[in-house]
Regions:
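Canonical Rossmann dinucleotide-binding motif of NAD(H)/NADP(H)-dependent dehydrogenases/reductases
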Residues: 2-34
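Active-site loop of short-chain dehydrogenase/reductase
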Residues: 7, 55, 82-83, 130-143, ...
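The beta1-alpha1 cofactor-binding region of Rossmann-like NAD(H)/NADP(H)-dependent oxidoreductases
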Residues: 40-41, 59-71, 105, 142
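Conserved amphipathic alpha-helix within the SDR
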Residues: 51, 57-60, 66-81, 126
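Substrate-binding pocket helix/loop in short-chain dehydrogenase/reductase
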Residues: 97-100, 104-109
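Catalytic loop of short-chain dehydrogenase/reductase
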Residues: 140-164, 169-170, 174-178, 191-194, ...
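SDR active-site lid
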Residues: 177-261
Length: 290
């Protein structure tokens, strides 16, 4: 898919962070973009800033709700006539800390409802219609190096959800190919440095019915600014990712036909080799640290 001009894209979680970077990069390519986001006020503010850049509109959507995503698909196909690019990008953290035994059921439900079921809902509502259209298209699911490649121990639930996305996307890609469709799938691993996204404060959108029964006090380093300051105080070099450049990187990967889109894949490959060696020998794989 070399020329994206005039194509229609849907980006979930597109009002801020990585999603907004992808949206801006798509607009640069002449793509008509529909942003799906759960935060109406943030979505409105984002649209005001993006309207001068191209054809873009928003639909308030809760990706954890199958009905909400189905309504989004109804809107897109009725209004735009097609969907060529679907970016299942919305994501959250569990908010329960790192130790698996300290996570509450609501932590698991909250994280998986957005990160896993959000992707599944997008697939279920859009992919059959995209196949039926007979048009070339791409489904891009946002995973993470944390879980998608190797789990970081202090983010156990989040890592588990991202591992699920990687497995689902790989299965989707094989099935789309076997069915001889015009669609393909790709998995995106955001990387390249420290990411200043809404993931740091994702708990602001957590539904009351999924609140923790035992609230946790904010831990040091739980915001982007705090974590960045901690790294700098420890003498570590901090590279903050330009989210628009990251969005452009994703779009280039889509145009190139890549299945895996991400920086630092050689390093990830070395990590996977170490994991594979450990698994082959029956050992616990080495912990990934970020």
């Amino acid at each position: 898919m070399d020329d994206l001009s005039g194509k229609v894209a849907v980006v979930t979680g597109g009002a801020a962070g990585i999603g907004r970077g992808i949206v801006e990069a798509l607009l640069e390519e002449g793509v008509r973009v529909v942003i799906a986001d759960v935060e109406a006020s943030v979505l409105d503010d984002t649209l005001k800033g993006l309207h001068p850049l191209g054809q873009v509109r928003g639909v308030v959507t809760d990706v954890s709700s199958a009905a909400s995503v189905e309504a989004l698909a109804d809107d897109v196909f009725a209004t735009e006539g097609a969907c060529h690019l679907l970016f299942n990008n919305a994501g959250v953290t569990s908010g329960g800390g790192g130790r698996p035994w300290e996570q509450e059921p609501n932590d698991w439900t909250w994280c998986f409802s957005v990160n896993v079921f959000g992707v599944a809902n997008g697939m279920l509502s859009f992919v059959p219609r995209m196949i039926e259209s007979g048009l070339p298209g791409v489904v891009v699911n946002t995973s993470s190096m944390d879980g998608g490649i190797a789990p970081v121990p202090y983010a156990s639930v989040y890592a588990s959800s991202k591992a699920a996305i990687s497995c689902l996307t790989e299965a989707l890609a094989h099935q789309l190919s076997a069915a001889c469709t015009q669609l393909r799938a790709a998995v995106f691993y955001p990387s390249g440095g420290l990411l200043d996204t809404g993931l740091w404060t994702a708990q602001r959108n957590r539904p009351p019915e999924l609140a923790r029964l035992k609230p946790r006090p904010p831990a040091p380093g739980t915001t982007f600014a705090e974590f960045k300051a901690q790294l700098e105080a420890a003498g570590r070099s901090v590279d903050v990712v330009d989210l628009l450049e990251l969005g452009r990187f994703v779009v280039r990967g889509v145009k190139a036909g890549d299945f895996i889109i991400g920086h630092g894949l050689e390093e990830a490959g070395a990590m996977l080799h170490a994991r594979a060696d450990a698994i082959a020998e029956g050992r616990l794989p080495p912990a990934a640290l970020s």
